[in-house]
Design a protein with these regions (language model features):
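Repeated loop/turn-to-beta-strand initiation elements of outer-membrane beta-barrel proteins
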Residues: 59-61, 95-99, 156-159, 194-199, ...
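Outer-membrane beta-barrel "beta-signal"
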Residues: 355-368
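Outer membrane beta-barrel
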Residues: 1, 6-21, 34-168, 180-182, ...
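Transmembrane beta-barrel strands of outer-membrane/channel proteins
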Residues: 12-22, 65-67, 102, 161-163, ...
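Gram-negative outer-membrane beta-barrel proteins
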Residues: 18-30, 69-75, 106-108, 167-171, ...
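Outer-membrane beta-barrel architecture
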Residues: 48-50, 88-92, 148-150, 187-189, ...
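Transmembrane beta-barrel outer-membrane domains
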Residues: 30, 38-44, 80-84, 138-142, ...
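Detector for outer-membrane/organellar transmembrane beta-barrel domains
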Residues: 185-319
Length: 368
């Protein structure tokens, strides 16, 4: 009886998405390529439950629990956590919305507080739509022990804020201490008719062990927007990053060394990136396109294993895609993307590395 009474006041709904695709990938190194069935290219597979309860006086408490998995083999995604995509408890009222738990960062499209719709792809569509390849600062899309806030809307403007205490206390890492990375972000959005503007500043307070030098903290500033004209929706966005962790296309900079796999993009990078794109209705579906450019410079303390004098990196990306709805909850899609890097080491002892790669995929997505 108690359980029955609880569900009279607590509205709950199952949530989920099942997605499979076939893709052809050329990472851009050693002429290797793969042709395989995979999942999560368009968007991540998930299953979960969400619910809310009206507390009266304009107050609501709710939760979201989402498990991520790979549909091609049934294995856990998101570091094999049970609710690795999102584990959120929130309170909402006239003051706005406050959430606690594991959730996506502002500068992504993952979860209840994300606002990172800077391109037609968001942060989905695999490597083709991965805006962090251009925006630098390879910050994880989801963090544990997060507090998030979203303000009420004032004349189309909303303020967003986040802080993560870092990973749970395990081994040498202690939550909320300097031994674990901590994340924070501040953002603002503006909506007026077809106009959508976004600005986000986010950073990682880098961890360091006792008695070691405090590393420079990662900083990223991202601005962008779109305008829906009906016949076409153009996008324009740009990011500045400092002391950032660079991201590579499909691990194209990983090199086998004497001590294992080495990442030639490891280190602190300063630079900027720009993405232009558009979406447009086409034959009952929607077509998307983006072009990206990034220019970055590694610090002189880069990774001594490779080049202590630093390095310069220029990156170009191009992507197209098309999605077609079969129903309100099911769609098919196809996409293709290309990237090219121009890496110049500042030491004559190293050979410049200029990977060039491709990705193409077709898939089926069903939401429930």
């Amino acid at each position: 009886k108690r359980a029955h009474a609880l569900f009279l006041f607590l509205e709950t709904d199952p949530i989920g998405c099942l997605h499979s695709n076939v893709d052809y990938d050329v990472p851009g190194v050693d002429d290797k390529s793969t042709f395989e069935m995979s999942s999560g290219n368009y968007t991540g597979n998930r299953v979960g439950i969400k619910g809310s309860e009206d507390l009266g006086n304009g107050m609501t408490v709710g939760f979201v629990l989402e498990n991520g998995f790979d549909s091609d083999d049934g294995s856990f995604d998101s570091n094999e956590d049970l609710f690795g995509r999102e584990a959120l408890l929130y309170v909402e009222g006239d003051f706005g919305k406050v959430g606690f738990g594991r959730m996506g960062i502002l500068n992504s499209t993952a979860g209840s507080f994300a606002i990172g719709n800077f391109t037609p792809w968001g942060t989905g569509w695999g490597a083709v739509g991965d805006q962090s390849l251009i925006f630098g600062a390879n910050i994880g899309s989801r963090w544990d022990n997060m507090i998030s806030y979203r303000s009420p809307e004032f004349a189309g403007v909303q303020i967003h804020a986040q802080y993560s205490f870092g990973a749970n206390t395990t081994g040498d890492e202690v939550e909320g201490k300097t031994t674990t990375d901590r994340y924070y972000a501040l953002g603002a959005t503006y909506k007026n008719g077809g106009l959508n503007l976004i600005g986000i500043v986010d950073s990682i307070n880098e961890k360091h062990a006792a008695g070691t030098e405090d590393p420079d903290d990662t900083l990223r500033v991202t601005i962008g927007g779109s305008y829906d004209f009906g016949v076409v929706k153009p996008y324009l966005s740009a990011a500045y990053f400092k002391d950032a962790r660079m991201k590579s296309w499909m691990d194209s900079y990983n090199t086998e060394g004497k001590t294992g796999t080495l990442d030639q993009l490891k280190g602190d990078w300063d630079g900027y990136g720009v993405i232009i794109g558009a979406s447009a209705p086409l034959v009952g579906g929607t077509a998307h396109m983006t072009i990206g450019y990034m220019d970055a410079e590694a610090q002189k303390d880069y990774v001594a294993t490779f080049d202590p004098n630093g390095a310069d990196l220029t990156r170009y990306t191009f992507a197209i895609g098309y999605e077609y709805p079969l129903s309100k909850r099911t769609k098919v899609y196809a996409d293709a993307g290309y990237f090219k890097d121009e890496m110049d080491y500042n030491s004559k002892d190293w050979i410049d590395r200029d990977p060039e790669g491709y990705q193409a995929a077709v898939g089926l997505v069903h939401f429930f």
